[in-house]
Amino acid sequence: MRRVVVTGLGLVSPLGNDVATSWNALLDGACGIDRITLFDVENYGCQIGGEVKNFDAAQYLPAKEARRFDRFIAFGCAAGMEALDDAGLKFEQGDPAAERAGVILSAGIGGLDMLCKNYGTLLERGPRRVSPFMIPGSIINLAGGELSILRNLKGPNLTTVTACASGLHAIGEASWIIRRGDADVMVAGGCEGSICPDGIAGFDVMHALSRRNDDPKHASRPFDTGRDGFVMGEGAGVLVLEEYEHAKARGAKIYCEIAGYGLSGDAGHITTPSTDGPGFQWPSR
């Protein structure tokens, strides 16, 4: 059985736009949750979120694409490129190793903001005024697709869309791809950018979001008896996974090894996990 290790890290978060900045802010006890500034939240029940700050998509994407793509794609590409740089991997044109390097970048919702803005354009100005980039700039698989173009990744390229588990499933599926010999390197993780009017409104009317607007720094408390919902965040977290012998042969820095991966569903409620936790038990057996 081929072994799978982690050799690269990439991160865009409410605490910083790279791994080092985010990690140092976390160690300093910083909190990235605050009042939402991306749009006017005055009439919303939930008015707080974990926004990515001071992020310029044009630093990571070609200028035209930075304007045309939803921001979740830019988050994913930024974190993916940081992870590849951290791993010391670069695949030039004509490099046969590129055919053994793939990508799985996932999201739970994808380009909701871009879709909704174009829907508004459709209603107000008609179908001919909708952006021709509405579809390619918002569909979830374009995050990995754009990264593969930017970094010449010609191996397996797919997307998992499983709500909050999307990024974890991306990493797990990527590890399986390497184990079975279909790739030597996989860039895998999740990206999301759904702090937008429709995203907040949709979760808020489900009573899924915290309304602790007067205390955003302490609003996210999932295991507290006083919890009142989750806090929407945005950003991307990406790993470079690599076959162990491949990593060792090139002298790569190895962070850890992925020992296993399991998945299941408890066939219960549409949003609420089963309280006795069978879905968490089965994959670990």
Model-predicted regions and their roles:
Residues 6, 23, 27-162, 191-202:
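Conserved beta-ketoacyl condensing-enzyme motif
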Residues 41-51, 110-114, 193-220, 238, ...:
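Active-site-adjacent elements of ketosynthase-type condensing enzymes
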Residues 1, 86-104, 117-132, 149-157, ...:
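Structural signature of cysteine-dependent C-C bond-forming condensing enzymes
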